[in-house]
Every structure is written in C-alpha cells, then in structure tokens.
Amino acid sequence: MGELLWSPTEEQKSQSEINKFKQYVEKEHGLFFPSYQELWTWSTTELASFWKSIATYFNIKFHSDFTTIVESPADPTSFIGTKWFAGATLNYAEHVFRNTTEKRPALIFQSEQQVKREVSWTELEFMVLKLQVYLKELGVQSGDRVAGVLINGIEAVALFLAVNSIGAVWSCCSPDFGEASIQDRFEQIEPKVLFANSNYYYNGRLFEKAESIKQLSLRLPSLLACVLIDDNIWEEILKMDLAQAELQFTAMPFDAPIWILYSSGTTGKPKAITHGVGGMLLEHMKALGLHQNVQDGDRFMWYSTTGWMMWNYALSALLMGNTLCIYDGATNYPDKLSLWKFAQESKVDHFGVGAAYLISCQDQDLRSLAYQPKTIGSTGSPLPPDVFEWLNLQFPKSQIVSLSGGTDVCSAFLSGCTLLDVYAGEIQCRTLGSKIEAFDEHGHHLYGEVGELVILAPMPCMPIYFWNDLANKKYFDSYFDKYSGVWSHGDWIKITAHDGIIMYGRSDATLNRGGVRIGTAEIYNVLNRTKGVLDSLVICVDHENGSSDMLLFVQLDNGLLNDALKGEIKRELRQQYSPRHVPDDIFQVSAIPYTLSGKKLELPIKKIFSGMTVEKAVSVDIMRNRESLLDFEAISKIWRRS
C-alpha cells in the first residue's frame, strides 16, 4: 500500500458532486450505501437503474423519450450491438449552450505567440451560429463527416460545436501529425469539409502547413470545401450578418455518431473508432461531475492536442457550466513553468496533464506560485508514487486524480472520488458503471495480484462501431477475442485491499521473467528516480528455446553510460523489487521514442529486437521523434549478432 497523502474533509465529502448523486439515488430508489464500494456495486449490477439515474440527475434533455434503457446484443460473446436508450433523441451542443451566462467566460485561450484571450458565452454561441450557417449552405447534413487539422484553440471548439449542432460527425488531427498519417485517417471517413490551420507555433518555432493541407485536400475526393483558418473564406464566415438568426440544434438518435477518433496506427492503418452522441454525453457528465468533482462555475483545463482523446474529454467541461481553459504550445516553452503560470493566472480549478509532464517537473519548486487547485489530474501513463508525493508536497490541499481509460471509450473508467483517500501510486477507484476486474490468463478473478484489466458489463461510451469495419471484425478482435463476453482492455492492473488500482503498463508490453510477469511501470518507477537518467524504455525479447532477455534503454542528461551507473540501476531494481527486475543488458540511446500522443513505443522496439525491420515494426508518421529509432536499429543489429 502506498503512503496516505490526502483525505477529504467532512465538508469536502458532503459538498462533493458524487455525494450529492449518492443521496439522490438513495432517495429515488429507497436505498442506502454506507460506502463508495456499495454504490459502485449497485451501479455495475443495476445498469438500467444507474444510467437512468445519471440521465435524470444531470437533467438530460431528450427530444423524444426512450422506450428501453439497455438491451443486450443477440451475440453473447461480445458487447457489440448493445442498445442504449432506444428511441431517445438529443443533441450534445444544446446541452453546452444551456449553460450560457454573462457571469464568466466560456473559454480562456493562450498560445506561445498570443496573449491570453477570453471568449464570452455569447461570443462563442454567435461564432458557432455563423459556422452552422456556412455548413448548411454547403449542404452538410446529419451524418456527414467534417474534419479538422487544427491546434487546440478557440476555432476547434467552435467548429466541433457547429458540426454537432446539425448532427454531422466530427474528426480531428493535430497539425503535428505527418501528412501520410492524416491521410490514413481521413480517407477512411470521406469528409465533406476540411478545416485547417495554415501554420502553428511549437517550442518557439513556426511551422507552415498551408501547402501540405492543399496537397491533402487534393487526395480527399469527397471534399466539398477546404477552409484555412484566417484565409478569405474564414474571414467571410466570421463577417456574416446574422443578427436575427438563432442557433438551431438537430435532435440525433442516442446512438448516432458524434465523433471519430483513431487508434495509434503504430503498425498499420489506424482504426476509426466511432462513438455515440448519447453515450459521450452521459459518460462525460458522469466522469467529470462525479469523479473529478467538476461543478458549475469551475474552471477546467487539460493540456492536450486535438489529436488526443483528452481534447474531447476536456471539451465536455462546457457541459458542466465550466470555463474551459486552453493552452496551445510546448509545455517547456519558454520554461517548465509556462503551464503552471497559465493555470494560476487563469484561476484554473481542475488542472490536468499527461503523467510524463509531471514527472519532468519534479526538479521544480512550485510553492512560490501560491496556487492550490481543487484537483490535479494525470493520465497517459502510470503516475509513479514519488510523483504523487512530490505533487502532494507542492499542493497539499489539492486532490490528485490519476485517470486511466483510453481512446477506445474516450473517457476514464479508473479515476478519482472525493469520498475516498488518495494513496501514493494508486488510482482511487473504479468509476461508477464500470464493471472492471483483474483476470489471470485463464479468466479467473484476481485481488491483490497483477492481472489483465477487463470490463464485465457494457458501457454506453464503448464504440458504436469502427468506421467501415465489415461485420465488426476489427472491433471484436480488438477487445473480445481473449475472453468470451468480456472486454479485454490491454492494461496490467492490481486491485488493492481498499479497492484502489495500481497500473503496471500495457499487458502486451509485460516483461516475462522465468514465468513471472512484471509491469514496465515498476522499472520506470526506479529509473525516474535515478540521478542522471532522463528517460528509459524496457522490453523483454523472447527466444525460441523459451528463454528471454530483458533489455533496458536509458537516455542520460549528459555524459556516457558507465559501469558505475549500470551497477546503481541494477542495485536499485534488485533492492526495491526483486532480482527478476534486473535487466540483462543496459544500453544508452539519444532519445526514447514516443507516439504523438505521448506513449512509449515499447512493442515496436520489441519487434525490432526480435528481427522485424523498422518499416514493418512501426509507422513513423505516428511518432513524435522518428529520429530516435536510429539508435535502436543500430543497437539491435549488433545485439542480434552477439
């Protein structure tokens, strides 16, 4: 068990959104839940009652009512085809703009090159109205796809809301994606319109995109129009005189598509993961309201690009009547405090980032900022215990909310709870409605032991389908081919004695040492604390004779890897964990390879060291730093000959 870091006060418990929801359910259903665990058990066994309670508690506006709440699919081997709120129609954007107020801004935006700008709710609504009129004039209809290659800015938010308001489907890539990577995504969905930034700044450098966007548009024959932000067409849209017009909302079936996200596409074409409008609306209000304690009037920020699902997740803070605070640019430009200063100056209540950024900030003393948000959120990779402890030292009054979920569900099914304590290295709880367990390889439940993260009941945030996935084959193979009738997520977890969760990394990157499986997060926990080591990556290469080699790669802050540092690393791994955690070889590399969404490329590196070519092992267009592969390719050739 990790160290107890934070406990909610009685006032925090009683005023929390999840406590208010618990009291609401108890009154409505004549029940009593003495603890969060009892509430969770009810929510995962009484699915219809729970999700109806979410809809009524958050006052979801249905244009037409539902006839049933949940209907199981005909095929019991998966959750594909589960029908939620049959007959219901609604609109996501309509739920955003019911929060319109002049008391606070809708958006606060800042980038590397622009001063902070506030956008009122009225200004945002008028911008969305103009974009809605333009899309309708083009002939965009419900179900059509509209795509963006956009920075995380005001325009991206307004465009999504306009697209959704007419029942069309949104899909977006970040402009730092490679041209082939963007084409691989958008050619699958055949968008009618493409919006894009002609340039953007990152780390103080200007990147021109106009020509590459032009070339992309020529390779997408479905396009009716391609609009660059700040070009003449965009300016004409914003100049429309619509003083007498009103924003209209198209009622959509509960399971109509809202947006299309994409798998990483590490080794092939990315899967086009399609989510339903009703599922996202209910799930995000539950996740933000109940599990991050996001309440009306708060200010919410999650640092993200538009190509990461956390952009969609953060957007839903607008559903909660929040001011959405947006920062676009490099996290360390001009220094590591840029994000923290923006959050402090913008009075952000809920500050969220990727775990890697928090790990990189450990050498900073942030107490001088005199900033204490309600919550500090982390996701993207496991947050090490020592980073929990550092955050607690810097922000003793803030609840640390570590999240885990994925693009697959566009949400977090492991998250926070203001009724519970925070322990170092642990996620507080399994979220309501998420029937998550840990399984061994035979499908047996595990408690207090490391196992595969599985979901035993459907959730409305699960994909409605993958775009152009005939007979749902890719969908089934992605989640249901390991355990019949059970969603296998691909993460390695342990459920603790007090029902917290410890993340151990991806199960497909698990290290097998003499039959004992080790999560990569344990290795990284030690390396993150090792002086002189900036970053690391570990793999296990299996051999035909049944043996294996654990290989550790380290990026140093300066100098060369020597025997003394190797010895220190091995000694710390042995002392803190076990002899099985000690690598067979340690190599120095210039950089650790990451995807654009911040994931370490463990599996592709394992494939390279197993003899696969770099070209077959990974699609470089999805990489943040493709040049980092050169060291791994060279080392693998030498290592395989030895």
Give, region by region, the residue ranges found by the protein language model.
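AMP-binding/adenylate-forming catalytic core of the ANL superfamily
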Residues: 173, 177-198, 332, 344, ...
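Conserved AMP-binding/adenylation subdomain of ANL enzymes
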Residues: 281-299, 309-349, 364
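ANL superfamily adenylate-forming
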Residues: 113, 196-254, 364
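Conserved AMP-binding/adenylate-forming core of the ANL superfamily
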Residues: 37-42, 93, 103, 107-161, ...
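Conserved AMP-binding/adenylate-forming
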Residues: 344, 375-403, 407-500, 507-510, ...
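Conserved pre-ATP/AMP-binding loop-to-beta segment of ANL
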Residues: 103-105, 228, 239-262, 269, ...
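Conserved C-terminal "lid"/linker of ANL adenylate-forming enzymes
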Residues: 225-228, 537-542, 551-552, 570-642
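Adenylate-forming
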Residues: 193-212, 328-332, 346-389, 401-409, ...
